From Swiss-Prot:
Gene3D superfamilies: 3.30.70.240, Elongation factor 4, C-terminal domain, Elongation Factor G (Translational Gtpase), domain 3, P-loop containing nucleotide triphosphate hydrolases, Translation factors. It comes from Lactobacillus delbrueckii subsp. bulgaricus (strain ATCC 11842 / DSM 20081 / BCRC 10696 / JCM 1002 / NBRC 13953 / NCIMB 11778 / NCTC 12712 / WDCM 00102 / Lb 14). This is Elongation factor 4. It comes from the Bacteria. Required for accurate and efficient protein synthesis under certain stress conditions. May act as a fidelity factor of the translation reaction, by catalyzing a one-codon backward translocation of tRNAs on improperly translocated ribosomes. Back-translocation proceeds from a post-translocation (POST) complex to a pre-translocation (PRE) complex, thus giving elongation factor G a second chance to translocate the tRNAs correctly. Binds to ribosomes in a GTP-dependent manner. One of its GO terms (cellular component) is plasma membrane. CDD domains: EF4_II, EF4_III, LepA, lepA_C. Its EC number is 3.6.5.n1. Its main location: membrane.
Length: 612
């Protein structure tokens, strides 16, 4: 292909992401676009076409961003190439949204016409503006009886500062308005401007391992061109490879002769390990490298930590390998080996939130056939030592004794909660109960308020979201960001089973709530741990002080059933023998603790603690 033809082809490329609050219908709109442009035949089309991970289809959510090339014949008679990137809407996966926006020139901002602007709509709009993207507002679900397009348009104008007077009105369900949306993508989103004559510069935004082709890198070409046979270099490692195949996803892989600046596609180069291709790295030409790498992605620190252990210690190496494979295309997952007296060898893993943790656990169990025990999640604390050294504590069991550190700090977040006026009181009551500090309140319109609190991350990660939804009948939406660490009065609570501390059950709580939480934990464990042949004493302790206890009574085996009546000596002898046996069993017998018990801390909601 000559340069002029390639430049003309580039003018017809449109790269855009579909962003929205969770459940506003991004994936459904993506399905309709694929259907209308005949990218996928009606026979092959299924709901959530781009959500190709089984777990995504099972849960009905988008977890990983996905790109697809769509060919569109526009009303001006020209053929256009769309690269559509579908993104997650859940706050845990906002890093996936920021990654996908870096590969685009425009964003289709989907707003549910019946619900209007929600918390994630706001944060995704800010992400798009940070990336200097053209934003195209779209109102979805206009076929619903409760849809109010005028209300949604005025909210987009007032709250986001975008002109929504001519926002496209569509229905992802019926396909109404999708043709107009496709035309607006052509006219409103600009073509990529990368220089084709410069050295190759491409951003890796995802990578996965294929048994036949090695590592498949999903890339956005910023400058230059790449074709099979070219020698490329990954700038971060300096390693060089020969390109074996380039292509696009449509939505299944389609080989191409060349990828040019502006294209979103894939490259394979016989790379054996995904660790050599970190997400956010820059690919360039080995012979004529570009001067500087692309900015890549900021590393998102984990918000939540949890211990992950195989139920059978022989699976340790399999778990390590599985985590390494997952980490390759989930850059936000962190893990390091750890040992627990109760659970043996495992890993301390860092996640972006509880949904992310659930998803990783389910993927490991489904895709790698592993049986896992997860310990209760915790945040990372800062213990300030007398020397001034800051010790990071991501596992409550590692917290030094109270006298050994000067103060303990925990991460705080700024939480923005959008809520209808009627529920403001309930939201404020909930936040105050979670140690929240009120900051401000913005009235967005006659009906809705944005309530802003600063509160400990530890209070949000457990069941805050569920409680928020139930106290506002599902109308509230939440967005939060870490703002730093604050010193608070925290203590570590150890749980002892038969006087043995179980490190995996330790947790950190505010001193004022410590006793209530310890009592709650003991009574929960009493329900969850099955009865044994010996008595199990459950105790909660701060240091050496026991603050709560519960007892699981043993099974009583009737050892006297075969004695004839009237032989009290024989009876007493057998009961004494049973007692001795139980005593021995108690000293050697390990209490069997089920998985539910390790997650019990999640179920200690405040109503239970307050005895309601």
């Amino acid at each position: 292909m000559d340069l002029e033809k390639l430049k003309d082809y580039q003018k017809h490329i449109r790269n855009f992401s579909i962003v929205a609050h969770v459940d506003h219908g991004k994936s459904t709109i993506a399905d309709r676009i694929l259907e209308l442009t005949d990218t996928v035949s009606k026979r092959q089309l299924k709901n959530q076409m781009l959500d190709d991970m089984p777990l995504e289809r099972q849960r009905g959510i988008t977890i990983k961003m996905n790109s697809v090339q769509v060919k569109y014949h526009a009303n001006d008679g020209e053929d256009y190439i769309f690269h559509l990137i579908d993104t997650p809407g859940h706050v845990d996966f906002s890093y996936e949204v920021s990654r996908s926006l870096a590969a685009c020139e425009g964003a289709v901002l989907v707003v549910d016409a019946s619900q209007g602007v929600q918390a994630q709509t706001l944060s995704n709009t800010y992400l798009a503006l940070e990336n200097d993207l053209e934003i195209l507002p779209v109102l979805n679900k206009i076929d619903l009886p409760s849809a109010d397009p005028d209300m949604a348009k005025s909210e987009i104008g007032d709250m986001l500062g975008l002109d929504a007077s001519d926002a496209v009105e569509v229905s992802g369900k019926t396909g109404a308005g999708i043709p107009e949306l496709l035309e607006r993508i052509v006219t409103d989103i600009s073509a990529p401007t990368g220089d084709l004559t410069k050295p190759l510069k491409a951003l890796i935004f995802d990578s996965k391992y294929d048994d036949y082709r090695g590592v498949v890198m999903s890339v956005r070409i910023e400058e230059g061109t790449v074709k099979p046979g070219d020698e490329i270099m990954i700038m971060n490692t300096g390693k060089k490879y020969e390109v074996t195949e380039v292509g696009v996803s449509s939505p299944h892989p389609v080989k191409e002769d060349i990828l040019i600046a502006g294209d979103v596609g894939y490259i394979t180069a016989n790379i054996k390990s995904v660790r050599e291709t970190r997400v956010g790295d820059t690919i360039t030409s080995a012979e004529n490298p570009t001067a500087e790498a692309l900015p890549g992605y900021r590393q998102i620190p984990p918000m939540v930590y949890s211990g992950m252990y195989p139920t059978d210690n022989r699976d340790y190496d399999d778990l390590k390998e599985a985590l390494q494979k997952l980490q390759l295309n989930d850059a936000s997952l962190e893990f390091e080996p750890e040992t627990s007296q109760a659970l043996g060898f495992g890993f301390r893993c860092g996640f972006l939130g509880l949904l992310h943790m659930d998803v990783v656990q389910e993927r490991l169990e489904q895709e790698f056939d592993l049986d896992l025990i997860m310990t209760a999640p915790s945040v990372d604390y800062h213990a300030i030592m007398p020397t001034g050294e800051v010790k990071l504590i991501d596992n409550p069991a590692d917290l030094p004794d109270a006298g050994e550190y000067k103060e303990l700090q925990e991460p705080y977040v700024k939480a923005e909660i959008m809520v209808p006026n009627d529920f403001v009181g309930a939201v404020m009551q909930l936040c105050e109960g979670k140690r929240g500090e009120f900051q401000t309140m913005d009235y967005l319109d006659k009906y809705r308020v944005n309530v802003i609190y600063e509160m400990p991350l530890a209070e949000i990660i457990y069941d805050f979201f569920d409680q928020l939804k139930s106290s506002t009948k599902g109308y509230a939406s939440l967005d939060y960001e870490i703002i730093g660490y604050k010193a608070t009065n925290l203590v570590k609570i150890d749980i002892l089973l038969n006087k043995e501390p179980i490190d995996a059950l330790s947790f950190i709580a505010h001193r004022e709530e410590a006793r209530d939480r310890a009592v709650q934990m003991c009574s929960l464990l009493k329900k969850l741990i099955p009865r044994q042949n010996f008595q199990v004493d459950i105790q909660g302790a701060i240091g050496s002080k026991i603050i709560s206890r519960a007892t699981i009574k043993p099974y009583r085996k009737d050892v006297t059933w075969k004695i004839h009546t009237g032989d009290p000596d024989r009876r007493a002898k057998l009961l004494e023998k049973q007692k001795r046996g139980k005593k021995r069993m108690k000293s050697v017998g390990r209490v069997e603790v089920p998985q539910d018990a390790f997650m019990a801390v999640l179920r200690m909601n405040d109503d239970d603690i307050n005895g309601k």
